[in-house]
Amino acid sequence: MISSQAFVAGMCAIGAGLASIACIGGGIGTGNATAKAVEGVSRQPEASGKILSTMIIGSALSEATAIYGFLIAILLVLKIGNIG
């Protein structure tokens, strides 16, 4: 039979791994936004200022979810050390 402490530690490790998937999503979102911004600037160079400012705002929102996932993963990993 598995102890409750080992079970909680295992679930924290699984949760940390799943939370770190948010970092992958943030990277993909930022990459897609940058690719489309470069494509838009190449088509309309005169609108580069507006395109780039919109891209920066979108990238910030995309990276916010990655940062939240990273912080949750860190908190769960630190919780594993305090279970014992």
Swiss-Prot record:
Ion transport as UniProt keyword: yes
PROSITE patterns (UniProt xref): ATPASE_C (PS00605)
Species assigned in the record: Clostridium novyi (strain NT)
Cellular component terms per the entry's GO annotation: plasma membrane; proton-transporting ATP synthase complex; proton-transporting two-sector ATPase complex, proton-transporting domain
Biological role: F(1)F(0) ATP synthase produces ATP from ADP in the presence of a proton or sodium gradient. F-type ATPases consist of two structural domains, F(1) containing the extramembraneous catalytic core and F(0) containing the membrane proton channel, linked together by a central stalk and a peripheral stalk. During catalysis, ATP synthesis in the catalytic domain of F(1) is coupled via a rotary mechanism of the central stalk subunits to proton translocation.
Assigned protein family: Belongs to the ATPase C chain family.
Keywords tagged on the record: ATP synthesis, Cell membrane, CF(0), Hydrogen ion transport, Ion transport, Lipid-binding, Membrane, Transmembrane, Transmembrane helix, Transport
Protein name, UniProt field: ATP synthase subunit c
